């Protein structure tokens, strides 16, 4: 009997050891990990414009746009950066003093500035920054795009810096789009398209606010924390979008419907650190230091990202000197229909699904933009130079469940080198 008990205990211990040797997966259900590259013009116009068939990146939201406006465009490269929570930092006098000191080269101001920034993030879900780089090609009715994107998420279920978690996310994506104009007359046109995105995503287990401050203050080694000291989840998905566009009056008025992020399931694995993830692709790419924690076995899991059904309209009369544009989108129609059947539906809930935008161009060189994104204003501008374009956008987004719960502002700047008229 004793031998049987000992055998069972040893089996349980062995099972526990095997289980413990596996890096547990980490999931963040409050973060939507669906991939979309930065589109500054789109942001300035209230994140509306799925029916607007201009600019090479329009096929990321509606692949039918490749059929509506065929031609040539090349971006080599594009680079964009977005910073969030600007207003809180500007209104914080101490934060601005530290920021000005940093600009003047005072490295001692980095830690107090980072502390104030984390304090101003508040509770709940937030974003700190987003950086995008990419190249793109539109050749007739075919679109190609390669994008690398880094996001810094923030999640705080408490009220202090100590309870704040920073979650870095990295995306590498290759997109192929095809759009065909099936009916083409001056009075009416019909286009349809599909785009496929091969996305590899990696995100870190949340890094505590205190650890971030240790890194900024020089009390912790950033390489050790990011490469070897923080578990990372990595995996792939192959989502695709489909879209149709109806054009009227020589495509000056367009009506569109899109289904975005279909098949948005990410097949993920857990890794003991980013260094081990990189070495899983190319063994020895990053030398493992002697004091690094031993790599644990990967655990496989899945992340579901939602697909959305969207409708849009755009009016862009073809004028020579002044080019006005008006756009309107209804986003995530399934959720809107669900809210209609709810006893708690309010008219203001419609604003959570309605995006509006307008643009006024002069000689197709200088452009001013304004929009409403789910009840919040956005503004922006763009200037086109020979083989280069600069776009800027500032606006607000809702990060809460209901309108007004957690609005966050952002400033986006994007520079494009190439030809994209």
Give the ranges of each region predicted by the language model.
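Outer-membrane beta-barrel porins/channels
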Residues: 21-42, 126-421
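Positively charged n-region of N-terminal signal peptides that target proteins for export
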Residues: 1-4
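Hydrophobic alpha-helical membrane context
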Residues: 14-15, 74, 273
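Bacterial N-terminal signal peptides
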Residues: 7-16
């Amino acid at each position: 009997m004793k031998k049987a008990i000992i055998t069972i205990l040893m089996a349980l211990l062995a099972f526990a050891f095997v289980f413990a040797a596996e890096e547990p997966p980490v999931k963040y259900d409050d973060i939507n990990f669906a991939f979309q590259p930065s589109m500054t013009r789109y942001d300035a116009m209230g994140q509306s414009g799925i029916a607007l068939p201009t600019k090479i990146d329009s096929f990321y939201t509606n692949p039918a746009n490749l059929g509506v406006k065929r031609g040539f465009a090349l971006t080599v490269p594009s680079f964009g950066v977005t910073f969030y929570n600007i207003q809180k930092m500007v209104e914080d006098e101490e934060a601005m003093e530290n920021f000005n000191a940093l600009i003047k080269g005072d490295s001692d101001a980095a830690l107090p500035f980072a502390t104030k920034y984390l304090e101003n993030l508040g509770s709940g879900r937030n974003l700190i920054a987003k950086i995008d780089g990419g190249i793109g090609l539109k050749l007739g009715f075919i679109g190609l795009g390669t994008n690398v994107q880094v996001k810094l998420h923030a999640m705080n279920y408490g009220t202090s810096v100590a309870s704040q978690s920073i979650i870095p996310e990295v995306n590498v994506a290759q997109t192929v789009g095809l759009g065909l104009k099936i009916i083409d007359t001056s009075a009416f046109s019909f286009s349809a398209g599909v785009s496929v995105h091969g996305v590899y995503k990696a995100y870190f287990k949340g890094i505590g606010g205190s650890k971030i401050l240790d890194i900024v203050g020089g009390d912790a080694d950033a390489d050790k924390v990011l490469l070897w000291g923080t578990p990372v989840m990595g995996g792939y998905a192959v989502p695709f979008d489909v879209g149709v566009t109806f054009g009227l009056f020589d495509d000056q008025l367009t009506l569109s419907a899109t289904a975005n992020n279909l098949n948005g399931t990410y097949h993920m694995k857990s890794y003991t650190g980013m260094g081990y993830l990189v070495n899983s692709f190319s063994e020895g790419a990053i030398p493992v230091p002697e004091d690094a924690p031993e790599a644990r076995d990967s655990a496989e899991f899945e992340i579901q990202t939602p697909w959305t059904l969207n409708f849009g309209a755009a009016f862009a009369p073809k004028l020579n000197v002044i080019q006005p544009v008006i756009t309107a989108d209804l986003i995530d129609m399934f959720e809107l229909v669900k809210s209609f059947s709810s006893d708690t539906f309010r008219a203001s809930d419609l604003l959570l699904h309605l995006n509006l935008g307008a643009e006024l161009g002069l000689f197709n060189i200088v452009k001013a933009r304004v929009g409403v994104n789910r009840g919040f204003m956005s503004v922006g501008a763009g200037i086109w130079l020979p083989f280069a374009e600069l776009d800027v956008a500032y606006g607000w987004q809702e990060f809460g469940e209901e309108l007004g719960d957690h609005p966050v502002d952002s400033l986006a700047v994007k520079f494009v080198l190439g030809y994209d008229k």
